[in-house]
Amino acid sequence: MGRVAEDGGDIIKMYFAIIDCGTTNSRVYILNGAAEVIYKGTKQIGVKDTAVNGSNEILKTGLKELFENTVREAGLSLKDIKFAITSGMITSEIGLKEIPHLWAPAGIAELAAGITPVQDRTIFPVDVPLLFIRGIKNSYPANATYREIRMVDFMRGEETQLMGLVTLYPELPLPFTAVTFSSHTKYFSINAAKQIVGSLTTISGQLFEAIKERTFVGKSIAGPDGDDEQYDDYFDPAVVEAAYDAVLHAGFLRALMMPRFMEVLLNDPWYIRRLFIDATIIAEDLRVLNDFNLLGFPEDINFVLVGYKQRCRIFKYLLQKYYGIKVVQEIVAKDQVDLLNIRGAVAIAAKAGYLNGKE
């Protein structure tokens, strides 16, 4: 935990909080009336605890402790906090309260209008109003079945991140496609009105973790402990192209096996094998572009990439080489990615009137 910025004294009288509840870790940011972060607290608690335990009581208790400790360490009391705002999986069935998704297209106006305020200690056991930002689901037919499943997708949390993106980077040419890399890869179409038209999601990040932890290929892509930074600095277009070619001609499942052969038979070093597996997954990931037309997403427009540095680099290389699509912005530094969520939450709260006297 630590102080991020100094408070502005008598000029700024009001404080509010942003709760960023992840899968395994959560963060609470305390902001002043000028929307400056003055303190940040973290705790190992997340929605995974609900999934594992079958109850959200541990999550509620952990978030309560984190919230109260962060407020206290910021030199404030709970009565100083006007409200807290949150988004993401905390609004799902394994969070604090399940909040229905908004229909796409939706932008900052729709998200602000859709805020669900709650002050109920059985939901969030702190005596502070909690504002839930709703996720967004694709626009698909009301009578959709599995036959239309390719049109169906949703997000929780990324809508806030994307509003932060268009707020912090107003110069981005509209419309554009944003791609975020985390436990999933998610593609988002942003229209000329800065609305989210919809999303397409793959399980790429979790697939990599499963391969790494649960298959014998994992041994072939593991490097020395603590060498992720060294790997992030390595890039060889020839390796990336070889992986793309393998997926294209031999298929995704066989390409996933190839780092094993590269280790045992070819004696390639671990970082080449790791780059190959990452490029293999991203090559398969790019097949999602085939469904852009189905959802009415523009195909030949600029891309913005957000997330892990190496995945962004591989994706950018393949996107430009094989699809001729330009990447106009990359946001890879963790503090800059975190800032998207903060600025997005602030922008939505401000649009809803919570930063100018709304109770």
Label every PLM stretch briefly.
Residues 25, 297-318:
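Glycine-rich phosphate-binding loops at beta-strand->alpha-helix junctions
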Residues 16-58, 332:
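Short glycine-rich, Thr/Ser-proximal phosphate-binding strand/loop in the N-terminal lobe
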Residues 245-288:
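Adenine-nucleotide phosphate-binding core of ATP-dependent small-molecule kinases
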Residues 46-55, 137-245:
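Glycine-rich phosphate-binding loop plus the immediately following alpha-helix
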Residues 73-152, 192:
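Short beta-strand-loop/turn "lid" adjacent to the catalytic site in phosphate-handling enzymes
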Residues 19-25, 89, 179-184, 204, ...:
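A short acidic Gly-Thr/Ser loop motif
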